[in-house]
């Protein structure tokens, strides 16, 4: 089996359905004997360019290990899901299990927001 990194972008109006989508894709992978090494929900982020007149979308990154038939099934699911705006599947040499650079940035942003919220709570 090969290692893959999958990034897919979901329509911002469908953000509440992302956890169910991730669970459905994880079930597809595990039932076919694959493994999931990392799942990161990057949240709603600014797009580099407009897609279907949208400036923001919900990003998800998955690092998996599966065979070609499972990968074909996932790609088919991405293509025919109207909520998925774009998807990218990249073959990796080995499994990535640590946090991605994008996830580190998300964690830094959340830490800044939490730090900014603490002084205002102390003043109130």
UniProtKB/Swiss-Prot annotation:
Record's keyword annotation contains Ribosomal protein: yes
BP-aspect Gene Ontology terms: translation
Stretches the record annotates as Disordered: 96-124
UniProt KW keywords: Ribonucleoprotein, Ribosomal protein, RNA-binding, rRNA-binding
Pfam families given in the database record: Ribosomal_S6
One Gene Ontology CC term in the entry: cytosolic small ribosomal subunit
Source superkingdom: Bacteria
GO molecular function: small ribosomal subunit rRNA binding; structural constituent of ribosome
Record's compositionally biased regions (Low complexity): 114-124
Family under the similarity heading: Belongs to the bacterial ribosomal protein bS6 family.
Function: Binds together with bS18 to 16S ribosomal RNA.
Annotated protein name in UniProt: Small ribosomal subunit protein bS6
Phylogenetic placement of the source organism: Bacteria, Pseudomonadati, Pseudomonadota, Betaproteobacteria, Burkholderiales
């Amino acid at each position: 089996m090969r290692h893959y990194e999958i990034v897919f972008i979901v329509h911002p109006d469908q953000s509440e359905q992302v956890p169910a989508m991730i669970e459905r894709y994880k079930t597809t992978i595990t039932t076919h004997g694959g493994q999931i090494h990392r799942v990161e929900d990057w949240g709603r982020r600014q797009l580099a360019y407009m897609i279907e007149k949208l400036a923001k979308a919900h990003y998800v990154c998955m690092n998996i290990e599966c065979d070609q038939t499972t990968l074909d099934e996932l790609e088919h699911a991405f293509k025919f899901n109207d909520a998925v705006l774009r998807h990218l599947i990249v073959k990796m040499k080995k499994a990535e299990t640590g946090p991605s650079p994008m996830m580190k940035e998300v964690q830094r942003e959340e830490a800044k927001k939490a730090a900014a919220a603490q002084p205002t709570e102390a003043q109130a």
